[in-house]
UniProtKB/Swiss-Prot annotation:
<feature type="transmembrane region" description="Helical">
    <location>
        <begin position="148"/>
        <end position="168"/>
    </location>
</feature>
<dbReference type="GO" id="GO:0005886">
    <property type="term" value="C:plasma membrane"/>
</dbReference>
<dbReference type="InterPro" id="IPR022914">
    <property type="entry name" value="UPF0397"/>
</dbReference>
<keyword id="KW-0472">Membrane</keyword>
<feature type="transmembrane region" description="Helical">
    <location>
        <begin position="109"/>
        <end position="129"/>
    </location>
</feature>
<dbReference type="Pfam" id="PF07155">
    <property type="entry name" value="ECF-ribofla_trS"/>
</dbReference>
<feature type="transmembrane region" description="Helical">
    <location>
        <begin position="46"/>
        <end position="66"/>
    </location>
</feature>
<keyword id="KW-1133">Transmembrane helix</keyword>
<comment type="similarity">
    <text>Belongs to the UPF0397 family.</text>
</comment>
<keyword id="KW-0812">Transmembrane</keyword>
<feature type="transmembrane region" description="Helical">
    <location>
        <begin position="73"/>
        <end position="93"/>
    </location>
</feature>
<feature type="transmembrane region" description="Helical">
    <location>
        <begin position="10"/>
        <end position="30"/>
    </location>
</feature>
<keyword id="KW-1003">Cell membrane</keyword>
<protein>
    <recommendedName>
        <fullName>UPF0397 protein SPG_0438</fullName>
    </recommendedName>
</protein>
<dbReference type="InterPro" id="IPR009825">
    <property type="entry name" value="ECF_substrate-spec-like"/>
</dbReference>
Amino acid sequence: MEIKFTIKQVVAVGIGAALFVVIGMINIPTPVPNTSIQLQYAVQALLSIIFGPIIGLLVGLIGHAIKDSLVGYGLWWTWIIASGLFGLVVGLFRKYVRVINSVFDWKDILIFNLIQLLANALVWGVLAPLGDVVIYQEAAEKVFAQGIVAGIANGVSVAIAGTLLLLAYAGTQTRAGSLKKD
């Protein structure tokens, strides 16, 4: 199976990964060590909804890997993969959020936030910590605490910033049937 990307999709991955890195450098600390409030997941969620799961996956994988390599901690693959999976999961449900059709009402906001909260809970509360325990032999209590705090922090930041980004994006789209021939 051959996957072909359009120029628009390639640009979305490049810009999305770059934004992931730049915004990811802004760290708002939490009481849990090595865990901070991250705002880049709002942009990743936006791109996942607009361009779909593969673009969301690539933005998270590439962006997080570059960010980790720049900050000097080394590549932490379980969390890099979790970032990609967050974009994948959100993108899989994009058809339920109607921003492409210039619609992002309360129903869409509710659906988007339900999807992203469940995705955050899954990838940060379960998959990333489980990977840390299995692959890196990290202490389960520590990594699950980090994962739960990261999931909550990311869920709140995406609920606020992601919703605002999607509202702004929906406002730029032409509503189906709104154009009439004179």
